Amino acid sequence: MRVFRSDSPEGPFTDGKGTPAVYSSYQLNYGNNSATNRGMKLMGAYGSWGAMTTGERAQGHNSAYVDDNGNAFVVYHTKFDNGTYGHQVRVHQLFVNSEGWLVAAPFRFTGLQTTTTQVATQRIYTADKLVGTYKVLIHPYKQNCAYNDNVSASYSKANEQKPHTVTLNADGTISGDMTGKWALTQEGTSYITLSLNGREYNGVTIRQNMDYYADVPAVCITAVSQTGVPAWLYKEETSTGIQSVRVDHNTTDGKIYNLLGQVVDSHYQGVVIVNGKKVLRR
């Protein structure tokens, strides 16, 4: 899914590099054999993100929706890396960064936790609240996510992006698997800039529940480079103090277990294990 914009409904529509959306001749524009990288990406094939156990890819057939309060959403279908052509519908909230480009929330929409107005008029997280260790996911161009390259690529793990770990330090530096700098910009807003391995991103900070967890809020950052490459970051907003959990039986069935290994219902409060991951339910 790509984004172009224009000052006029009649165009011309261009991306951040000034490349037009209109082609003068046929050019393959997806997959690892693509001849052009035009358009600002919203997302690509990815896996192991948050609590997801099945990777998602080949997102498309999308529609945009804006509610009466100006909150925007992208509705699309996604395929999976499980060896089938089955698909499901997903909804991600959209935000606008300081450069006027759309960026997609890192997780599926499960209820309004951050509004478009809040991003533009409030500092949802102060700098000290943003300091910490994050998972980061980059969505590059030329991912092998469509069947022009290989019949199985539409539903395989080919070129699926996996998260790295970085730390946003109090001195404005970024360390870990990727390095760079970060800074909040425009006082009274939730705009942020990041530099990751030499690439500059403009984005927003938002609060959002992690996928597959109904009540686990995360500190999230969604951003895009001027060349159209998106970056997602998140860290859990709450911590249980448990660093790791050993599970001797399969817990990828969606059932909820307490720390004694007993199955509990969705109303159970406290530390539980869901799909092999710890969750604090309140």
Q: Where in the sequence are the language-model features?
A:
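Carbohydrate-active catalytic/glycan-binding domains of CAZyme proteins
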Residues: M1-T238
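Short, acidic/polar N-cap/turn motifs at the starts of alpha helices
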Residues: H61, V91, D253-G254, Q269-V271
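Residue-level detector of functionally pivotal "anchor" positions at catalytic/ligand-binding pockets or at interdomain
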Residues: E237-L260
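C-terminal tail/sorting-segment detector
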Residues: V271-R282
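Structural motif
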Residues: S175, L196, L259, V274-N275
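C-terminal trimerization/auto-chaperone modules of long, extracellular attachment fibers and adhesins
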Residues: Q262-V264
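Surface-exposed, short loops/turns at beta-strand junctions within beta-sandwich domains
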Residues: Y213, S266-Y268
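A glycine-anchored, Pro-Gly-centered beta-turn/N-cap motif
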Residues: L130-T133, Y268-V272
